[in-house]
C-alpha cells in the first residue's frame, strides 16, 4: 500500500500538484493508519525539514529559538522576518480534504458492493434451504426402505433358525435312535445266559476302547435297574403280567463292571509302580464313571506306603518317644511331633502334586488322604503318648503324676493344630480338618477339667508331704545338732513361705494356659478358669491359715509356759529364783513366738497380694465376657481369705496378750516400792526413769519392731491402738499398787515421759491423748495439798481417776485430803 500511494503522488512543493488517488486495495491485508498518513504527508514535509536543516548550518542557532523566551525576543532589538513559519500547511490542508473526499467515495463503493453481496447471499441461502428440504425427504424415504428391508431380513432369519432347530433336533433324534439301537443290541447281549460274558461284542473286550465300554456299561446298567424298578412298582400295584425282565442283564452288567473296574485298578497300580502319570490319569478318568471314582480314590490312598508300611509306624514312635524304655519329656515329645508332622506335611504335599496330575477331582482325593492321615497315622502316635490316667489311682508325682499327662496333652494338641493348619494350606478339599482334629482329642477334653483340678490337688499334697518330711527329719536330727537349733530350723520350715505361694500361683498359671488352649467358647473358658482359680484359692487359704495356726500354737505354748511358773507369795528364795529363771525363759519363748507370728502375718499379706495381683492380671480378663463370673470369683476369693483373716486376728490378740503379760512381769519384778517413795525425800531427786520403765520400753521397742515391719495400713493402726490402750490400763493398775511422795511423783513424770515418747511412734491419736491425761493426773503427787482443787478445773472428766491417784499420796491421811476433796467434789464422795 505504501508503494502504490507513492507512485500516484509524486513529490512537489506545490499544494495543488498532488493528485491523490486512493484504491480499495490499499485497505486490504495488514492495514495501518500510521503508514497511510505517513505516505500522504511525506511528499510535503521533507522539503520543509531540508530547508530548516540548511538554515541551521549557515547561521548557527536560530535567532527565533535562541532569543525567544515566553513569547518575547531576548538579546536582539531587530524585528522578525515576515516569511511564514510553516509554509506547507496549505498543501497539507488541501491534501487532507482530497483524501477525505476520496475516502467518502470509497465508502460508497464498498457499501454498494456489500448490498450486492447481501442480495446474492440471500438468493443462495434460499436455494440451499430448498435443497436441504428435498434431501431430508429423500433420507426419510431411504430409512423407510431400510426398515422394510430389516423386517424382511428378521423374518427370513427366524424362519432359518426354526429350520435349523428342526434340523438339529432331527439330527439329535437320529443320533439318539442310533445310540439306542446300539444300546438295545448290547443290552440283549448282556440279557442272555446268566454269567455268560463270552458272547459279548468286541467293544467290551478291546483294551483300546475301555473308556467307551465303561460308559456304555454304566448306561446299560442304569437303564436295566430303572426298568426293574418300574416293573416292581407295577407288580405291587397289581397291573403287570409276570414275564421275564432284565434281571439277567443287571447281574451280567454288574459282573462285567466289577471285572472291568478290577482290570482298570490293576492297570492303575502297574502304572503307579512305574510313575506313569498319563496312564494313571487315563485309568482314573475311566474309573470316575464307577461310583464317581470312589473305589479308585480310596484304593490309591490305601496303597500309600505311610499307611501300609509297619516300619513307618515304628519310625514315628521312635522319632516322638525316643528309645524304648526311656521316660519321654514334654519338650522332647514336642520336638519329635514337630519333626514328624513336618515329614507328614511334606509327604502330603508330594502326594498332592501326583493327585492333581492324575485324578479328575483332586479335592475329593485330598480330603480322603488327609482324613486317613489324621485318623490312622496321627491317631496312632497320639494313642502312644496320651495314655489317660485314672483319677482314682493317679500315677505318683515321682513318675510325673497327672501333670505329665496334662503337659503331654497340651503339647500334642498344639502340634496337631499346627499340622491341621499346614494340611489346610496344602489342600484338603471340603474336609473340615479343624473339626476332625478336635474330634481326635474329644475324649481327653471332656475330662480335662477334672484332671486339671486333680493335678493341682496332687501337686499341693506332694508339696505338703515334702514339707512335713523335711520338718520330721529336722526334728529327728535335733538331738545331733542341738535341741534349740533343731527347733529353730523346724520352726522356720513350718513358717509360711512366699516362695511356696508363688509356686502355687505358677502351677495355676500353667493350668490356666492349658485351659485357654482347650476351651474355645467364652462360657466354657470362664467356667473352667473359675474352677481352676478356686483350686488356687483353696490351696493358698489352707496353707496360710495352717501357717498362722502353727504360729498361734507357739503363742499358746508360750502362754502356757508363763502360767506354769506363776507362784504364790510364800515361797522359798531358792524356789523363787528357779521360778524367775523359768519365767525369763518363758518370756524369751513369748518374744520369739511374737516375732514368728508377725513374720507369718507379713508373709500372709504378701501371699494374698500375690494372689490378688495374679487375679487382676491373668484371671479377670478371662471372666469378664461372661456375666456374673467375675463377681462370683471375687466373692469366692473374699470368702477363702476370710479364714486366714480370722486366724490372723486371733493371733494378733494373742500377740497383745503376750506383750502385756511380759510388761506386767517386768513391772512386777523390776518396780521397787522405793522408786516412787524414796526415804531421802527432799534431797536432789533422781531425774532418770525407773529401771522398770527402762526395761519395759526397751522390751516394747525390741518386740514391736517386727510388728512395725509386718503390719501396714489399717491393720497396723488397729493393732497399735489396741496395744496402746491395753498398756495405758496396765500402767494405771500397776501404779495404784504404790505410794508416792513428791520426789516419787517427779520420778513417775519421768517414766510417763518415756512412755509418751514411745507410744507417739504408734501414730494413734487416741492413745496419745490418754497418755497425755496420765501426765496431767501424775501432777497430783507434785503439787501442794491446797492446790489440788484447782488442778483439774479444765479437765473434769479425769477427776475420778485423779481421786484414785490422790489416795496414793503419802500425805493423803495426814493432810486430811479426803475431807477437803469431798467438800469440793461432792459428786465423787
Curated annotation (Swiss-Prot):
Tissue expression: Expressed in seedlings, roots, leaves and flowers.
Gene Ontology cellular-component annotations: cytosol; exocyst; extracellular exosome; membrane; plasma membrane; plasmodesma
Keywords recorded for this protein, A-Z: Coiled coil, Cytoplasm, Exocytosis, Secreted, Transport
InterPro entries reported in the protein's UniProt record: Sec10-like, Sec10_HB, Sec10_N
One of the GO BP terms on file: acceptance of pollen
Localization, UniProt: Cytoplasm, Cytosol; Secreted, Extracellular exosome
Coiled-coil region: 244-266
Pfam families recorded: Sec10_HB (PF07393), Sec10_N (PF20667)
Gene3D superfamilies: 1.20.58.1970
Phenotype of the disrupted gene, per the record: No visible phenotype, due to the redundancy with SEC10a.
Subcellular location, principal: cytoplasm
UniProt function note: Component of the exocyst complex involved in the docking of exocytic vesicles with fusion sites on the plasma membrane during regulated or polarized secretion. Involved in polarized cell growth and organ morphogenesis. During cytokinesis, involved in cell plate initiation, cell plate maturation and formation of new primary cell wall.
Known partners and oligomeric status: The exocyst complex is composed of SEC3, SEC5, SEC6, SEC8, SEC10, EXO70A1 and EXO84B. Interacts with EXO84B. Binds to EXO70E2.
Similarity comment: Belongs to the SEC10 family.
The protein's name: Exocyst complex component SEC10b
Amino acid at each position: 500500500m505504501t508503494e502504490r500511494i507513492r507512485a500516484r503522488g509524486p513529490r512537489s512543493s506545490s499544494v495543488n500538484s498532488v493528485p491523490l488517488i486512493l484504491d480499495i486495495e490499499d485497505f486490504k491485508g495488514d492495514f495501518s493508519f500510521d503508514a497511510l498518513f505517513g505516505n500522504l504527508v511525506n511528499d510535503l514535509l521533507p522539503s520543509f525539514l531540508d530547508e530548516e536543516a540548511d538554515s541551521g548550518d549557515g547561521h548557527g542557532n536560530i535567532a527565533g529559538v535562541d532569543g525567544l523566551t515566553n513569547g518575547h525576543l531576548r538579546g536582539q532589538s531587530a524585528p522578525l522576518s515576515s516569511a511564514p513559519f510553516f509554509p506547507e500547511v496549505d498543501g497539507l490542508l488541501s491534501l487532507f480534504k482530497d483524501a477525505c473526499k476520496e475516502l467518502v467515495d470509497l465508502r460508497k463503493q464498498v457499501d454498494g458492493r456489500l448490498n450486492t453481496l447481501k442480495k446474492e447471499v440471500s438468493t443462495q441461502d434460499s436455494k440451499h434451504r430448498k435443497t436441504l428440504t428435498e434431501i431430508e425427504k429423500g433420507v426419510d424415504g431411504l430409512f423407510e426402505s431400510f426398515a422394510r428391508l430389516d423386517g424382511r431380513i428378521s423374518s427370513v432369519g427366524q424362519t432359518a433358525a426354526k429350520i435349523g432347530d428342526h434340523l438339529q433336533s432331527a439330527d439329535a433324534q437320529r443320533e439318539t435312535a442310533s445310540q439306542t439301537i446300539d444300546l438295545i443290541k448290547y443290552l440283549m447281549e448282556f440279557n442272555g445266559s446268566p454269567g455268560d460274558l463270552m458272547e459279548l461284542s468286541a467293544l467290551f473286550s478291546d483294551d483300546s476302547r475301555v473308556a467307551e465300554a465303561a460308559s456304555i456299561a454304566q448306561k446299560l446298567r442304569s437303564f436295566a435297574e430303572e426298568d426293574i424298578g418300574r416293573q416292581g412298582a407295577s407288580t405291587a400295584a397289581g397291573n403287570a403280567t409276570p414275564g421275564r425282565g432284565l434281571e439277567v442283564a443287571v447281574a451280567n452288567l454288574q459282573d462285567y463292571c466289577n471285572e472291568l473296574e478290577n482290570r482298570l485298578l490293576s492297570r492303575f497300580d502297574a502304572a503307579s509302580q512305574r510313575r506313569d502319570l498319563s496312564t494313571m490319569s487315563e485309568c482314573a478318568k475311566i474309573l470316575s464313571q464307577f461310583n464317581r471314582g470312589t473305589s479308585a480314590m480310596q484304593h490309591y490312598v490305601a496303597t500309600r506306603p505311610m499307611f501300609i508300611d509297619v516300619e513307618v509306624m515304628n519310625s514315628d514312635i521312635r522319632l516322638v518317644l525316643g528309645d524304648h524304655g526311656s521316660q519321654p519329656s514334654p519338650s522332647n515329645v514336642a520336638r519329635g511331633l514337630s519333626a514328624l508332622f513336618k515329614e507328614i506335611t511334606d509327604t502330603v504335599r508330594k502326594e498332592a502334586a501326583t493327585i492333581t496330575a492324575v485324578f479328575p477331582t483332586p479335592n475329593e482325593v485330598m480330603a480322603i488322604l488327609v482324613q486317613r492321615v489324621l485318623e490312622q497315622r496321627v491317631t496312632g502316635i497320639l494313642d502312644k503318648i496320651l495314655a489317660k490316667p485314672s483319677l482314682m489311682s493317679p500315677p505318683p508325682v515321682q513318675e510325673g503324676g497327672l501333670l505329665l499327662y496334662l503337659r503331654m496333652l497340651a503339647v500334642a494338641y498344639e502340634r496337631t493344630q499346627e499340622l491341621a493348619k499346614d494340611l489346610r494350606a496344602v489342600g484338603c478339599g471340603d474336609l473340615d480338618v479343624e473339626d476332625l482334629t478336635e474330634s481326635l482329642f474329644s475324649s481327653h477334653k471332656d475330662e480335662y477339667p477334672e484332671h486339671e483340678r486333680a493335678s493341682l490337688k496332687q501337686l499341693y499334697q506332694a508339696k505338703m508331704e515334702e514339707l512335713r518330711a523335711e520338718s520330721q527329719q529336722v526334728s529327728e536330727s535335733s538331738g545331733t545338732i542341738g535341741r534349740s537349733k533343731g527347733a529353730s530350723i523346724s520352726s522356720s520350715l513350718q513358717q509360711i513361705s512366699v516362695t511356696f505361694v508363688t509356686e502355687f500361683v505358677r502351677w495355676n498359671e500353667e493350668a490356666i494356659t492349658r485351659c485357654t488352649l482347650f476351651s474355645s467358647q467364652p462360657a466354657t473358658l470362664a467356667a473352667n478358669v473359675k474352677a481352676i482359680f478356686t483350686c488356687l484359692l483353696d490351696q493358698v487359704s489352707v496353707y496360710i491359715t495352717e501357717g498362722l495356726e502353727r504360729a498361734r500354737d507357739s503363742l499358746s505354748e508360750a502362754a502356757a509356759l508363763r502360767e506354769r511358773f506363776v507362784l504364790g507369795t510364800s515361797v522359798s528364795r531358792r524356789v523363787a529364783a528357779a521360778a524367775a529363771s523359768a519365767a525369763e525363759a518363758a518370756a524369751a519363748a513369748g518374744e520369739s513366738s511374737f516375732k514368728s507370728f508377725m513374720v507369718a502375718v507379713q508373709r500372709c499379706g504378701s501371699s494374698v497380694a500375690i494372689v490378688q495381683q495374679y487375679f487382676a492380671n491373668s484371671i479377670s480378663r478371662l471372666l469378664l465376657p461372661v456375666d456374673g463370673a467375675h463377681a462370683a470369683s471375687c466373692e469366692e476369693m473374699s470368702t477363702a481369705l476370710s479364714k486366714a483373716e480370722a486366724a490372723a486376728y486371733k493371733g494378733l490378740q494373742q500377740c497383745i496378750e503376750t506383750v502385756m503379760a511380759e510388761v506386767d512381769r517386768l513391772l512386777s519384778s523390776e518396780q521397787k516400792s522405793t522408786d516412787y517413795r524414796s526415804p531421802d525425800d527432799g534431797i536432789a531427786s533422781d531425774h532418770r526413769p525407773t529401771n522398770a520403765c527402762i526395761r519395759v520400753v526397751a522390751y516394747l521397742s525390741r518386740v514391736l519392731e517386727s510388728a512395725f515391719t509386718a503390719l501396714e495400713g489399717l491393720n497396723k493402726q488397729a493393732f497399735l491402738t489396741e496395744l496402746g490402750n491395753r498398756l495405758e490400763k496396765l500402767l494405771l493398775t500397776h501404779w495404784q499398787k504404790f505410794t508416792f511422795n513428791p520426789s516419787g511423783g517427779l520420778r513417775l513424770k519421768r517414766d510417763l515421759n518415756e512412755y509418751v515418747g514411745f507410744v507417739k511412734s504408734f501414730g494413734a491419736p487416741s492413745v496419745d491423748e490418754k497418755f497425755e491425761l496420765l501426765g496431767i493426773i501424775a501432777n497430783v503427787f507434785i503439787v501442794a495439798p491446797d492446790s489440788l482443787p484447782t488442778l483439774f478445773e479444765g479437765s473434769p472428766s479425769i477427776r475420778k481417776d485423779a481421786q484414785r491417784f490422790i489416795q496414793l499420796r503419802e500425805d493423803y491421811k495426814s493432810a486430811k485430803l479426803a475431807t477437803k476433796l469431798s467438800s469440793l467434789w461432792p459428786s465423787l464422795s
